[in-house]
Amino acid sequence: MTTGFDLTVEEQLAILMSREVNDWETSACGALSFIPATAMLLGREMRAPNAEIIILGSRDYSPFVTGKDFHFHAQRGQLDLFFISAIEIDQHGNFNLHVIGDRDEPDVLMPGQYGTGMLYYAVPRIVMFRTEHTRRSFVDQVNYVSGAGTSPKGVSRRTREVKVITPMAKLNFNQESRIMELGSVHEGFSVDQVVENTGFNLGIRGEIDTTPQITEEEVHTLRTVVKSHMIDSETYPNEAANLIREP
């Protein structure tokens, strides 16, 4: 996927995730979310000029006084798309942002998810992402369920679409079978490579699509318009300066 453009992983993911931003919808990400913030700004430039963007903690794209206000906004049904960075993801659509290992005596203790588990129920479209595609990230069963991919019968849930985007592939959560499936493979990778680096069955049936190629226009817009805007608007300016290449 990076052939010809010398993309960083952050650039690649931002471009692929930007394609999920729709016009006339409200897309959002939490704090400490450089990649999805970049994706939303690029998506607005490329194909969704009327998209509303919420980037928690930013100067220009965070209309809320507290995170609690943002959560109320979501619970009222006013978000269409939310981006989640998960540490572990399993075949049932569960994600982990808390611990690796035993819950009481963890090998790794992570910051947690600050309401993301609730947003996983409240927002119609969810896009998760990882900067790596390995068996330690895509596991048969997460060590801790920070967000549940399925709900018990009788529990209200607005989420109708869940995708996962990685440097290798895009996965789709099948709402009927309740299993994460392989949706497409990025240029430069094979289905076998994705399978080898995934710790669960990807439900492959028939031929798998190739992800549409990253275009010169997407790369140029990211490295010029979006990078400049992020620096000028103080929206992750240091990350934009260091992780988005020069045109």
Q: What do these predicted regions represent?
A:
Residues 14, 28-31, 37-39, 48-51, ...:
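A sequence-composition feature that detects small, non-aromatic residues
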